[in-house]
Amino acid sequence: MKTVTGFASATIGNVACGFDVLGFAITEPGDEVILTLREERSGELPVSITSITGDGGALPRNPKKNTSSFVVLKFLEYIRTNKGIDFEGHIELELKKNLPLSSGMGSSAASAAAALVAANELMGRPCNKMELVNFAIEGERVACGSAHADNAAPAMLGNFVLIRSYNPIDLITIPSPDNLYCTLVHPHIEVRTAYARSVLPRMISLKTATEQWGNVGALISGLLTSDYELIGRSLVDVIAEPKRAPLIPGFYDVKHAALEAGAIGCSIAGSGPSIFAFSSSPETASRVGEAMQTAFSTLKEKLQSDIWISPVCKQGAKVI
């Protein structure tokens, strides 16, 4: 019997202007996946789920429908076909959910990435992370019906990741300033990813597209040159944020509070309802978080929220 534990942290997709093509990882919180290797096959599939905690019973226990087990099944198929590793044993999977579901924090991507690094370690590391990330992306299809990479890629690789192309997949990791801090606030409501995608326009004007492209390019430049002022100017989303903001009570009040407290920029984390803000110091990031939480709690709905302050995670998914 051999046991390996994988960990992958929360991620923030879109990063305001980079809808479906940009995301980054933070250091905490994150999901843990514990895999135990048994020599003898138990059941029809080579993977079974023995335990899921932290999900309130919401996640499927069927290995073909749960993101973490689904990606391990795909990984095992791949190494049999492409690496000559014919796995005859059985893997028991335990998932510890530390990320809230439907939160905009890359919950499904974290589970998939953690499971994959653990499975890769268990099998003797036959794959590199660029190979593994393809399975994590497919895991998103199981979770929300769309194989988007803006959470899966940074969850696996760390840092900021730009998805230049989906067909074929072409990922570019982007370094970021050491003193760039993220404040992430999660109000205690849910926004389903599938629904948040359904409210988006199917077509946009050339004028809107041009404005969005300009912000994406400028944001990348700001990250590469540690130009915090440019980073802040570029965190403008003219496509998704206007349509998704009504799904988050008090979004503009919270955003205003963050900017007034010193944040260089603020937007919706992924599909929401979490909101993120960037600051250039941990002290400012903490002050921004307090202001955002206060803004949520003083709404008519008096929303409670959780908060995390974190630098950008440079490593990505790892074995712990």
UniProtKB/Swiss-Prot annotation:
It is found in: Cytoplasm. It comes from the Bacteria. GO terms for biological process: threonine biosynthetic process. Keywords: Amino-acid biosynthesis, ATP-binding, Cytoplasm, Kinase, Nucleotide-binding, Threonine biosynthesis, Transferase. GO terms for cellular component: cytoplasm. Catalyzes the ATP-dependent phosphorylation of L-homoserine to L-homoserine phosphate. This is Homoserine kinase.
